[in-house]
Every structure is written in structure tokens, then in C-alpha cells.
Amino acid sequence: MTKIAIVTDSTAYLGPKRAKELGVIVVPLSVVFGEEAYQEEVELSSADFYEKLKHEEKLPTTSQPAVGLFVETFERLAKEGFEVVISIHLSSKISGTYQSALTAGSMVEGIEVIGYDSGISCEPQANFVAEAAKLVKEGADPQTIIDHLDEVKKRTNALFVVHDLSHLHRGGRLNAAQLVVGSLLKIKPILHFEDGSIVPLEKVRTEKKAWARVKELFAEEASSASSVKATVIHANRLDGAEKLADEIRSQFSHVDVSISHFGPVIGTHLGEGSIGLSWYIEK
């Protein structure tokens, strides 16, 4: 039986306990405030990041892991007797992390590195990792795992509502005119991943109406399914996340609802107060 390791990056926001339970290795991305870089969830927690954000005039930037960090990780796994690594990462359209993993894989001898572009991030990415880890424990071969991840991708969706448009503007996803008009009209864009990129799905007036629409879109997919895993993801807005989670639980008894968070790297792009809803149609 092939000895397979699962590697991912920090934007899955697994946390140390869950990563250990799954038996996966996490390579961190970084956020950069001025000249200072911090590995997210290692040198800078999500709570500290959002607190720091309140006192900084300039929005931080983000940085993918260096190729060398992946090389070190893969070399260590090779020495530990692993024959194959399946390296699962956030969308290659929003970060070069996936490409860094592939580059590192081509530089390391004695182990095969198979990259997997999740086309998404955060809890949906974590679900890819969890599904892969489960199959590894069941003794599946690499191709079976990749084929299963492709099936998971077809049944995964996520929608986000951004609280403050200025983060999207400063990150280059909205121009100045869109920012002014959107702010004046209280427009709350519903965002989603399309071919791996974060793009507006619909533009709705007021946050309340935006979330009503998100629940409608969720219902269109979830109502006819028999088993659904949903996650409410928040950027330092636990009260809003809990409220939405309770609403979904009361409306859909067959949906397993959990709560997760946008950590520093993804929080930099979406901004504090943003909330997302992701789901995976199990059957």
C-alpha cells in the first residue's frame, strides 16, 4: 500500500487540533503589516489580527509560502517514508500557493507530489482536506483520492456577503466609482467563487436583503438533498454567524451546521464583519 501524506495551507483554517486529528501538515501563508510579516495562525492569531487591523491606517498585504518552505516539508516527509504527497491548496486564481507547491514538488527527489487546486478556500478547502485524509486512512490509492475530490468539488458551493466595500476596493476588486455608488446605496454584493476567482454573483440593497437572498440560493440546492454539511464563516463577527447558523438549523433539519472563521489572509481581502455560507451536498 502506498504511503500517502496530505499537505495543505493555513487558509483552510483547520487549527492545530483538527490538523493533528486528520494527520495533515499545514504550510502557513503570511500577512504583512508594513515591513513586518507574520505567519497566520502561527505568529499572529485571528483575534490579534482583527485587533491590529483596527489600529492600522494601511491595509496589510498577504504573502504565499516560499517555495523553500514547501521543499523542506516535502523532504521531511520523504525521509519519514512517505511515497506520495497530495498537496491541497486555496484557489490558484487568488494565490500562488498551489504553484509554489508544484514547483517545490519538482525539486524534491524520492517522493511524488500531486498538487490539488481546490478552487476555493477556508472551510470548503478544509473539507477537501478532511475527505482526502479519510480516504488515506481507508487505504485508498492517490488516483481514487483525486477522483473523489473532483466529485466533492462538484457538490461544493459558497457565498459571501462583505460588510465593508473598502477592503474590496483597496484589494483591487472594486474601482473608486463602484465603491462610492455601492456605499451610498448600501449595496451588499453577494460574492461567490467562479472558476476559482471571487466575483460578484448579485448586488443587493442592504445586508438583511442580501442574507435573505443567500438563504434562498442555499435552499434551492439544499432542499432536495438528504444530507448537507453547511458552515457559516465569519470575519470577527461571531454573533452574526451564530444568528445565521441558528436560522439555517431551524429551517433545514437535515443540514449539519457548523461555524468557522476567516483568518488573517482571507480576512485581509474580505474585511472585518464579512460572513460567508459554504455547503457540501453529501447526498
Curated annotation (Swiss-Prot):
Keywords: Lipid-binding
Single Gene Ontology MF annotation: lipid binding
Listed name of the protein: DegV domain-containing protein BH3627
UniProt cross-references to Gene3D superfamilies, sorted A to Z: 3.30.1180.10, 3.40.50.10170
Residues reported in the UniProt entry to bind hexadecanoate: T62, S95
The organism's place on the tree of life at top rank: Bacteria
Role summary: May bind long-chain fatty acids, such as palmitate, and may play a role in lipid transport or fatty acid metabolism.
Organism this protein belongs to: Halalkalibacterium halodurans (strain ATCC BAA-125 / DSM 18197 / FERM 7344 / JCM 9153 / C-125)
Pfam families: DegV
DegV domain residues: 4-281
Record flagged with keyword Transport: no
SUPFAM superfamilies registered for this protein in UniProt: DAK1/DegV-like
UniProt cross-references to PROSITE patterns, sorted A to Z: DEGV (PS51482)
